[in-house]
Amino acid sequence: MAKQSMKAREVKRVALAEKYFAKRAELKAIISDVNASDEDRWNAVLKLQTLPRDSSPSRQRNRCRQTGRPHAFLRKFGLSRIKVREAAMRGEIPGLKKASW
């Protein structure tokens, strides 16, 4: 189980990313615009740097919904491999069965 503080930190990162998404997209558009002046582009870079670090979506980590485990996360289920296996063995995931050949 992940610490509660780590889970809370991830929730905070998701909220910050949503809050600053439009502002970040606007600044990135200015930075990548070749027709914008160098001064405008540089000012956009400086403004982007003043935004909170955790507002960047790349700072988010996928975690298991049940345990908060950050490694071996399966996106399709939103769970770690361990919890997917446990749920599959109990028959809780429709259409998923143990491989046999």
Curated annotation (Swiss-Prot):
User: What are the recorded GO MF terms, alphabetically?
Assistant: rRNA binding; structural constituent of ribosome
Q: Name one GO biological process term.
A: translation
Q: Does the keyword Nucleotide-binding apply?
A: no
Q: Which keywords has UniProt assigned to this entry?
A: Ribonucleoprotein, Ribosomal protein, RNA-binding, rRNA-binding
Task: Return the similarity comment.
Answer: Belongs to the universal ribosomal protein uS14 family.
Any idea what job this protein has? Answer: Binds 16S rRNA, required for the assembly of 30S particles and may also be responsible for determining the conformation of the 16S rRNA at the A site.
UniProt xrefs under PANTHER family: 30S RIBOSOMAL PROTEIN S14 (PTHR19836), SMALL RIBOSOMAL SUBUNIT PROTEIN US14M (PTHR19836:SF19)
This one is known as Small ribosomal subunit protein uS14
